[in-house]
Amino acid sequence: MALLGVNVDHVATIRQARGTNEPDPVTAAALAELAGADGITIHLREDRRHIQDRDVELIRQTVKTRLNLEMAATDEMVGIALKVRPDAVTLVPEKRKELTTEGGLNVALLRQTLKKHIDLLKQGGISVSLFIDPDLEQVKASHRIGADAIEIHTGAYCDAACAATRSKELDKLTNAVKAGNKLGLLVHAGHGLTYFNIQPVAAIGGIREFNIGHSIISRAVLVGMDRAVREMKDLVGGA
């Protein structure tokens, strides 16, 4: 059964919109765990637009499952990770003007820089995942430079405008998952997944973990964190 990592970034987004102390993503992370989340994901962006350094430190201290820290592959972020010691790091591309992460890392192009950071993180006892598009060359490149895991970007599947395109993107996801498994990589998936589109991806098999944020937090606003997490966990595990 696949695991569910709950991303609480958007709780911090609401807080930062008013410049106040609430809602607190630290509390949201605890509630998600109580509802059955298998892990907590947070993205400390270079511009600190939502998650702040204090959030990372406090969630690290209070999380009872496992903490996955998403971050750019920079010296600053690697230093923070080595200090805070999350259970896992997911390296992602960042653009200052993007609303959310727009695509996967070009591992083949950035292999030297990424390998340097991967080696440092692994020496610090931190598992490293790379956020990549469902492209077989990127899967192979991730394996070659020593990643422990890959997180496959599901955005193109989620944004597909018609059934034919969606089916094509689902095939790409399936092939990337199979390739990752064959190479011995842990395979995760995320980005744009909702209560309405998760099941075909969960049915692929071979995906160890789904990291989902916006959809869960959006539903939690209406029905509460407990119900929102439990409903998504049922979909992830019961496909």
From Swiss-Prot:
List the Pfam families hit by this protein, alphabetically: PdxJ
Q: Where in the cell is it found?
A: Cytoplasm
- What positions does the entry give for 1-deoxy-D-xylulose 5-phosphate binding? 9-10, 45, 50, 100
| Recorded metabolic or biological pathway in which this protein acts | Cofactor biosynthesis; pyridoxine 5'-phosphate biosynthesis; pyridoxine 5'-phosphate from D-erythrose 4-phosphate: step 5/5
Q: Name one GO molecular function term.
A: pyridoxine 5'-phosphate synthase activity
Give the domain of life: Bacteria
Q: SUPFAM superfamilies of this UniProt entry? A: Pyridoxine 5'-phosphate synthase
**Where primarily located?**
cytoplasm
Q: Which reaction does it catalyse?
A: 3-amino-2-oxopropyl phosphate + 1-deoxy-D-xylulose 5-phosphate = pyridoxine 5'-phosphate + phosphate + 2 H2O + H(+)
List the catalytic residues: 43 (proton acceptor), 70 (proton acceptor), 191 (proton donor)
Which PANTHER family does this chain map to?
A: PYRIDOXINE 5'-PHOSPHATE SYNTHASE (PTHR30456:SF0)
Summary of the function given for this chain in its UniProt record = Catalyzes the complicated ring closure reaction between the two acyclic compounds 1-deoxy-D-xylulose-5-phosphate (DXP) and 3-amino-2-oxopropyl phosphate (1-amino-acetone-3-phosphate or AAP) to form pyridoxine 5'-phosphate (PNP) and inorganic phosphate.
Family as reported in the entry's similarity comment: Belongs to the PNP synthase family.
Its name, as the record gives it, is Pyridoxine 5'-phosphate synthase
Task: Give the originating organism.
Answer: Syntrophotalea carbinolica (strain DSM 2380 / NBRC 103641 / GraBd1) (Pelobacter carbinolicus)
Identify the gene encoding this protein: pdxJ
